[in-house]
Amino acid sequence: MPTNLLLALVLAMTITPAYGAALPPCPASPNCVSSQAEDKHRIAPFVVKGDPAQAFSCLHTLLLKRSDTTVVAFDKSMIKVEIRTLLGFVDDGLFLLAPDMAVIHVRSAARLGYWDLGKNRRRTEEIRQQFTQACLSQ
């Protein structure tokens, strides 16, 4: 199999999780939150009301409008973002649509450092509030 084709397959599989796919686990450090974590990293998923695909598309639009956020990958079930902090650090965000559960799973983690002073949790809650106002009140 040609190397380019193999590389394309690997990339497609890593950036396009299936519905209900698992988020990567958080590291032991306190600089990550995940709606699929069972410990101190746990944060609630975004609840979807109405059409899940429409809500997910609305979340995508909301993320595109944020000045600190760059959408690096998007498909019908996954949004992957990079978020630049005021100090220039880059955090990674991942949103996975689980339409059968009427939720969007979320993970946000710092790329560097040990402790983020709760920034990923606060930012995720801020995005949740924006999502609720913009996407669920239609």
Question: Where are the regions that the model predicts?
Answer:
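Bacterial N-terminal signal peptides
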Residues: 4-16
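Ser/Thr-rich, low-complexity intrinsically disordered terminal regions
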Residues: 16-138
